[in-house]
C-alpha cells in the first residue's frame, strides 16, 4: 500500500474544521482510541510543579572542597561540626526541607559557590 504523507497533509490543510472534527471522531471509533490528552496524569504532574511552594535542598556531592562545604552546611543548618560533616559525608542527603523557593535558591547558590553539587526537589 502506497502511503503519501505529503498528499495527506495537503488534504488536511484544505479541509474545514468540521471535516477535521469528523475525521478525528472516525479515527477514534475505528481504532478505539481517544484524541484527548491524559489530563489526569499529565495535569497533576505539571500542576504540582507549577504550584510548588516548598522545596527540599539536596546535597548530591560535596565536590573537591569538602571542608568548605561542611562549613557552609554547618552555617545553613545550625548543626554542630560533627553532624554537618556526617550530613556531607552521607551525600546525597537533604540539607534543608520545606523551604521557600527564594531561600532554597540562596542555599543552592552558597553550596555551589564552594564546589558542591545541589538539586532542588
From Swiss-Prot:
Keyword Nucleus applies: no
CDD domains recorded: Ribosomal_L7_L12
Pfam families (alphabetical): Ribosomal_L12, Ribosomal_L12_N
InterPro entries per record: Ribosomal_bL12 (IPR000206), Ribosomal_bL12_C (IPR013823), Ribosomal_bL12_C/ClpS-like (IPR014719), Ribosomal_bL12_oligo (IPR008932), Ribosomal_bL12_oligo_N_sf (IPR036235)
Cited function: Forms part of the ribosomal stalk which helps the ribosome interact with GTP-bound translation factors. Is thus essential for accurate translation.
Family stated for the protein in its record: Belongs to the bacterial ribosomal protein bL12 family.
Protein name, as recorded: Large ribosomal subunit protein bL12
Natural source organism: Limosilactobacillus fermentum (strain NBRC 3956 / LMG 18251) (Lactobacillus fermentum)
Gene: rplL
Amino acid at each position: 500500500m502506497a502511503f503519501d504523507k505529503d498528499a495527506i497533509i495537503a488534504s488536511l490543510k484544505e479541509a474545514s474544521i468540521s471535516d477535521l472534527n469528523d475525521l478525528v471522531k472516525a479515527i477514534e471509533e475505528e481504532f478505539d482510541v481517544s484524541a484527548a490528552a491524559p489530563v489526569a496524569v499529565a495535569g497533576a504532574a505539571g500542576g504540582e510543579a507549577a504550584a510548588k511552594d516548598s522545596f527540599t535542598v539536596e546535597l548530591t556531592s560535596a565536590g573537591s572542597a569538602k571542608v568548605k562545604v561542611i562549613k557552609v552546611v554547618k552555617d545553613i543548618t545550625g548543626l554542630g561540626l560533627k553532624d554537618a560533616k556526617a550530613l556531607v559525608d552521607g551525600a546525597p542527603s537533604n540539607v534543608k526541607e520545606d523551604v521557600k523557593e527564594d531561600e532554597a535558591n540562596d542555599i543552592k547558590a552558597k553550596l555551589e559557590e564552594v564546589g558542591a553539587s545541589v538539586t532542588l526537589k
